[in-house]
């Protein structure tokens, strides 16, 4: 099948060759003979009602010294592409939202966008998880200090975090008797002006925060456990955690079964579930990672699984 695949991502020259999941996807697409086109947010624009971009034909290589090569930039409508991977990392700011509007125009013109632009806007990675209370720890979302304090007192040991953070930034643990709850709440809620999340602390974090990758609603059979550094409560690799690939547990598969149908319904083809012990904590939809670590440990080809799912959807559209 001849496919023209575009990708919107952060600068490719700055990625980590060893760890970057977008590169794994591009290599898998190129292995199928698909034609690749590279874009950054700044390259997207709209003219006369058409979403367009200054895009560069791209070749990628499994070579840590040289992993990409551009051809001459072209100016084309996004509807010249069959599929676009939206792989721009957070922050989830207004520029991110404007990008989804432009991609939504391409989608209306017949392009498959992964993940679906509307769902990228709708599915906040922390709030989305609360739609599955059977899977999550005790969870509260509020900006009122009295409501948050009451929850903290009931739980005794809680994690407090912003709704828009990534990489473990601004995550606090509060235990009964700690004197600093007021300043934590003031800081995170910006003196009561921003909603935050509080969750019951999960001691199982010591054994790792598991990243489970979902491809079109089905779990990859292995996960990456991100184990906190000594003295830390955050498993995020960006916060100093280390990764350890593992097979999924029965509970992991059960959680995936609870969430999979909703992901398919919302056009979320590639998603990362964060699970601590037996509890779902977040659903990452913007630019999930950990493909390379799992592939290297178990010989999987997760990028290939995603391309299979994309090809299936493109064939279904063509009838």
Swiss-Prot record:
Domain of life where this protein originates: Bacteria
Listed Pfam families: GSH-S_ATP, GSH-S_N
SUPFAM superfamilies: Glutathione synthetase ATP-binding domain-like, PreATP-grasp domain
UniProt keyword Manganese present: yes
Note accompanying the cofactor annotation: Binds 1 Mg(2+) or Mn(2+) ion per subunit.
InterPro entries the UniProt entry points to: ATP-grasp, ATP_grasp_subdomain_1, Glut_synth_pro, GSHS_ATP-bd, GSHS_N, PreATP-grasp_dom_sf
Key words, A-Z: ATP-binding, Glutathione biosynthesis, Ligase, Magnesium, Manganese, Metal-binding, Nucleotide-binding
Location of the ATP-grasp domain: 125-311
Residues that, per the record, bind Mg(2+): 282, 284
Cofactors, names only: Mg(2+); Mn(2+)
The protein's name in its UniProt record: Glutathione synthetase
Organism: Pseudomonas syringae pv. tomato (strain ATCC BAA-871 / DC3000)
